[in-house]
Amino acid sequence: MSKRKRVLVKFSGEALAGENGFGIDTAVLKFIASEIKELIENDIEVGIVIGGGNIVRGVSAAKDGIIKRTSGDHMGMLATVINSIAMREALERSGLEVRVQSAIKMEAICETFIVGRAQRHLEKGRVVIFAAGTGNPFFTTDTAATLRAIEIGSDMIIKATKVDGVYDKDPKKFKDAKLLKSLNYEKAMSDDIKVMDDTAIALAKDNALPILVCNMFKAGNLLKIINEEEAALYSVVK
């Protein structure tokens, strides 16, 4: 019997806002839930990390000096908890079993992150959503996602974005931008390529964790990527 694949999918908070640019678009939640359900139905174990930028970004909140950076980051962590609860509701409504685990204790709302418990949930076919980042300021949710992926023994981390993958330059500004199907960790950390922050990429490199970047709004693409189908559209950093 072949080993089941285990993946961690990272969604940005901004993506949850849809066209509104702020808050949570329930139509986006419903779409993501259908994509995750397809993975579970194909015997794939799924962990999720969601950013909080649709509600508040720690760096932006601290920009004018009124709010300290540490407080801004704590606000950002709480924003990820809000998004995680919303995602849990959408996934449960689609018929899936879900657990939210927070890096910060809030027992009345969700479980506290314990790696062994998270792994057991995954083995039982439950989706696990990891909230509150790493629990520490100055670390992005990309770094938190990479850390959790390594801790749970994920085969890969998938960064689900609004574009088809990693380009050699901004495809919104340059019509001749080219999609890079594969690139190494060093290239991914270069100034002209923005995949994740350098801390997240360095962590992935040190642990040989592949980073796959794809468009979250292409139906069925997540499953195609995990199954390594030719029709899958994504970039891989390894």
UniProtKB/Swiss-Prot annotation:
Region (Involved in allosteric activation by GTP), start-end ranges: 18-23
Keyword annotations: Allosteric enzyme, ATP-binding, Cytoplasm, Kinase, Nucleotide-binding, Pyrimidine biosynthesis, Transferase
Lineage top rank: taxon: Bacteria
The protein's name in its UniProt record: Uridylate kinase
Family: Belongs to the UMP kinase family.
Pathway this chain belongs to: Pyrimidine metabolism; CTP biosynthesis via de novo pathway; UDP from UMP (UMPK route): step 1/1
Compartments (UniProt record): Cytoplasm
GO molecular-function terms, A-Z: ATP binding; UMP kinase activity
EC numbers on record: 2.7.4.22
Name of the gene: pyrH
Pfam family, one: AA_kinase
